[in-house]
From Swiss-Prot:
Protein name: Protein unc-50 homolog A
Location in the cell: Nucleus inner membrane; Golgi apparatus membrane
Job of this protein: Involved in the cell surface expression of neuronal nicotinic receptors. Binds RNA.
Membrane topology: Multi-pass membrane protein
Cytoplasm among keywords: no
Entry GO MF terms: RNA binding
Cysteines engaged in disulfide bonds, as pairs: none
Cytoplasmic topological segments: 1-82, 134-158, 203-222
Entry keyword annotation includes Thylakoid: no
Entry keywords, A to Z: Golgi apparatus, Membrane, Nucleus, RNA-binding, Transmembrane, Transmembrane helix
Species of the source: Xenopus laevis
An example Gene Ontology biological process: protein localization to cell surface
């Protein structure tokens, strides 16, 4: 079971928030608190973040059950502790250095690749996906409109980070051990192993994203988030039939980036 922290009740005995309490629950106040804690490592719960990372592989449903607990105790779905983001950034740095080593990049080239991966691939793409999902879910997936039936933007970004972490570990860490001697061998076994790794990684991303939105009780038709599995399976079969090697394309793209 995921560890939790005790918090004070979110409202007075009459169930109505005072003006001061209401101000503390605004989106701006939550964002300010999150960013402020980003520079205070002693206030972050890294042990809990590590537990979440483990459960994202073994039992991701438990992670989203904790989001339910946070909503009940702190009146927000999104994380208020940036520890997960910090640990994810460390994982990105370590795995990107590993990619630089495997691809025989110089120190400067590896540093440029690191900037691209952190600020574009993770944060930049994450902001776009979170904003798109925030708009789509609030516009088309909410059962009924109301302030209590609103998908927080911060939560959509958390869902992206949750789904991105397993993808990162699979593509940027596990795959490293197979690139030079297996995946880039030029044989069928090479692109079979590489493309299968991509299938598993993207499949994880789709599934954990689905779990994130299906965990919100006020959303409908969340099963449509599983539909990309059909396109993913078709693309996988086509890639094997036509000899496409996704990892080879990724390596060429990374080398092109750091020129």
């Amino acid at each position: 079971m995921l560890p939790t922290t005790s918090v004070s009740p979110r409202s007075p005995d009459n169930g109505i928030l005072s003006p001061r309490e209401a101000a503390r629950h605004t989106a701006g106040a939550k964002r300010y608190k999150y960013l402020r804690r980003l520079f205070h490592f002693k206030q972050m719960d890294f042990e809990f973040a590590l537990w979440q990372m483990l459960y994202l592989f073994t039992s991701p449903q438990k992670v989203y059950r904790n989001f339910h607990y946070r909503k009940q105790t702190k009146d927000q779905w999104a994380r208020d502790d940036p520890a997960f983001l910090v640990l994810l950034s460390i994982w990105l740095c370590v795995s990107t250095v590993g990619f630089g080593f495997v691809l025989d990049m110089s120190f400067f080239e590896t540093f440029k690749l690191l900037l691209w991966v952190v600020f574009i691939d993770c944060v930049g793409v994450g902001l776009l996906i979170a904003t798109l999902m925030w708009f789509v879910s609030n516009k088309y997936m909410v059962k009924r409109q109301g302030k209590d039936y609103d998908v927080e933007w911060g939560y959509t970004f958390d869902v992206h980070l949750n789904a991105f972490y397993p993808l990162l570990v699979i593509l940027h860490f596990i795959q490293l051990f197979f690139i030079n001697h297996v995946i880039l061998s030029g044989w069928f076994i090479g692109y079979f192993v590489g493309n299968t790794i991509w299938l598993i990684a993207i499949g994880y991303y789709i599934y954990i994203t689905f779990l994130g939105y299906s965990a919100l009780p006020f959303l409908k038709n969340t099963v449509i988030l599983l539909y990309p599995f059909a396109a993913l399976a078709l693309l996988y079969v086509l890639s094997l039939a036509l000899g496409w090697n996704f990892t080879e394309k990724l390596c060429l793209f990374y080398k092109y980036r750091v020129r």
